[in-house]
């Protein structure tokens, strides 16, 4: 069993991490997620780099069986489907927050 952690800026996912430490498998989500984060950060008028960095968080880990590379890829694909263009637009318009 491997720990899976999703990294978010506010409520917008950015990265999938499977495992721990230097040997962890990491997958950056596609550029559209990075662009959504940038737009939401600019829209929310972050005052400093520290304010921006303070909004990054790791979700609570969950366990999955299998090959770490496969797990990371599958989790990234799930996020790509769940966070379609429309959902990212809603998040951007709400300053990166789901509620």
Question: In which residue ranges do the predicted regions lie?
Answer:
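Residue-level marker of positions within ordered structural domains that often coincide
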Residues: 16, 38, 84
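Short, charged/polar N-terminal "headpieces" of proteins
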Residues: 1-27
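Charged, low-complexity, helix-prone segments enriched in Lys/Glu/Asp/Gln
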Residues: 3, 7, 35-43, 72
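A general marker of short, structured functional hotspots
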Residues: 4-5, 29, 48, 79
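Acidic, low-complexity intrinsically disordered segments
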Residues: 48-99
């Amino acid at each position: 069993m491997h720990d899976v952690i999703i990294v978010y800026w506010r409520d917008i996912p950015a990265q999938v991490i499977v495992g721990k430490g230097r040997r962890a498998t990491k997958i950056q989500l596609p550029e559209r997620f990075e662009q959504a984060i940038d737009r939401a950060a600019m829209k929310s008028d972050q005052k400093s780099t520290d304010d921006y960095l303070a909004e990054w968080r790791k979700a609570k880990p969950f366990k999955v069986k299998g090959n770490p590379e496969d797990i990371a890829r599958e989790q990234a694909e799930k996020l790509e489907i769940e966070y379609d263009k429309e959902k990212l637009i809603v998040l951007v318009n709400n300053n990166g927050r789901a509620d």
